[in-house]
Amino acid sequence: SECLVGSEMCIRDRYNMYWILFIGIALASWLVQANLKNKFEKYSKIPIDGGLTGRDIAVKMLHDNGIYDVEVVSTSGSLTDHYNPANKTVNLSEDVYDTCSVAAAAVAAHECGHAVQHAHAYAPLKMRSSLVPVISFASNWMMWVLLIGMFTLNVFPQIMLFGIILFAATTLFSFITLPVEIDASRRAVKWLSEAGVTNNRNYGAAVSALRSAAYTYVVAALGSLATLLYYVMIFLGRRD
């Protein structure tokens, strides 16, 4: 009886610890996102020298790196900027594509950093790209599998375990994304410094914006890991 009470207290303590962890990560995520939004709103109002738009920045960076087979296109929405290795396109959101600002330059250079990675066969990018089909499947089904798994854990624990494996795949993807995004920002910062498209003040602002963006990926990866551990704890706790 004492062992049972002790076990229940141990499980309750673990739950409390993870709830504190969740709240901490959620708060950190909110602060990072708020900081990033404020910086990009601020830097979107600061023009760069030469009147170069986001598209101009992207084309120049690609050409400076000897890349001529990547197209720069405009895509609808906000914060929809991305590089598509499948069709070799740098997709810039409308508020970046035609805008001459420090924020637009930073975003465009970052996305072109991915194109440079692709051209140089950067290993983490290749690994991330190879995982996309698996992650797409996992993302579509993992929450349903986990939900069913929690209701049937005492009868069919294999369902919950399968859900945890799917979630673990997305967590792994989050951590593989970190070096890819950080390296793309590093390439962007290096090019912005060498290309002469920003002055000293604007360059510092661009670096600050890119650094803040990188923090969002770190927080997202830690949040995914914390959630994974939470599901693992439920699985192991119920098995006890």
Regions found by a protein language model. Name each.
Residues 1-2, 62:
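Structural motif
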Residues 3-11:
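Short, small-residue-biased leader/transition segments that mark boundaries at the very start
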Residues 10, 91, 167:
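Conserved beta-strand segments that form the floor/walls of ligand-binding pockets within enzyme
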Residues 14-39, 149, 156, 161-164, ...:
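Hydrophobic alpha-helical transmembrane segments of small proteolipidic membrane proteins, enriched
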Residues 22, 142, 156, 163, ...:
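Hydrophobic alpha-helical transmembrane segments of integral membrane proteins
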Residues 33-138, 172-240:
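Polar-ligand-bearing catalytic/cofactor-coordination segments
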Residues 132-156, 191:
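Post-HExxH zinc-binding segment in Zn-dependent metallohydrolases
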Residues 151-161, 170, 195, 225:
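Loop-helix junctions at membrane interfaces
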